[in-house]
């Protein structure tokens, strides 16, 4: 089993520029665009697995983006003194959350830019969804005005079907001969 090098709360740096591989949720950022420059500091907020063998870290970087990164794309901060200065602005809140005054979910919400509340909330006028697709069915449904539905005409009464003709009954089985038991030929000693 693989073990993770970094734990939640550790301060790390991007070892190389991290680019959008198509999984970053902001449609304004195109595939291949740099999300995080090399050397940018961030804090590990989640540790998970990809394909059950690759450890992936969710990192809240200083530029406000939360990006998933593999272990080989990260490196430890140079020294602990710089790491304490480079922690995100929500660190005092993290200490308060540890004491029970604020839930941990609030910490993440303070660092993450707000997402649109509804599907397609960012582009009703252009009829595109938040993913940037112009032909998204849900975006078209969001953009269409609500029209009161008119009741459909009642369906015509169906004509009665012809009664099914019953199949001819099978003739009764004819005994092949007297038998004593199932499949046993008749007795040969004169009994009937």
Curated annotation (Swiss-Prot):
Residues 85-102, 150-165 have a biased composition (Low complexity). It comes from the Bacteria. InterPro entries: Nitrogenase_MoFe_mat_NifZ (IPR007415). Coiled coil: none annotated. Pfam families: NifZ (PF04319). Keywords: Nitrogen fixation. GO terms for biological process: nitrogen fixation. Residues 77-102, 117-192 are annotated as: Disordered. The keyword Transferase does not apply. Belongs to the NifZ family. This is Protein NifZ. It comes from Frankia alni. The lineage of its organism: Bacteria, Bacillati, Actinomycetota, Actinomycetes, Frankiales. The gene is nifZ.
């Amino acid at each position: 089993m693989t073990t993770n090098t970094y734990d939640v709360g550790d301060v790390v740096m991007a070892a190389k520029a991290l680019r959008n591989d198509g999984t970053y949720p902001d449609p304004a950022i195109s595939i291949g665009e740099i999300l995080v420059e090399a050397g940018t500091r961030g804090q590990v907020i989640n540790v998970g697995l990809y394909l059950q063998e690759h450890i992936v870290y969710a990192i809240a970087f200083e530029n406000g983006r939360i990006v998933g990164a593999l272990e080989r794309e990260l490196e430890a901060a140079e020294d602990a003194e710089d790491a304490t200065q480079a922690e995100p602005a929500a660190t005092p809140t993290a200490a308060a959350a540890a004491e029970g005054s604020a839930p941990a979910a609030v910490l993440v919400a303070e660092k993450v830019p707000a997402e649109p509340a509804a599907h397609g909330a960012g582009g009703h006028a252009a009829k595109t969804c938040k993913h940037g697709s112009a032909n998204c069915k849900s975006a078209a449904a969001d953009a269409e005005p609500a029209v009161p539905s008119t009741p459909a005409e009642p369906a015509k009464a169906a004509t009665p079907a012809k009664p099914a003709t019953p199949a001819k009954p099978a003739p009764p089985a004819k005994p092949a001969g007297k038998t004593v038991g199932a499949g046993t030929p008749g007795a040969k000693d004169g009994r009937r």
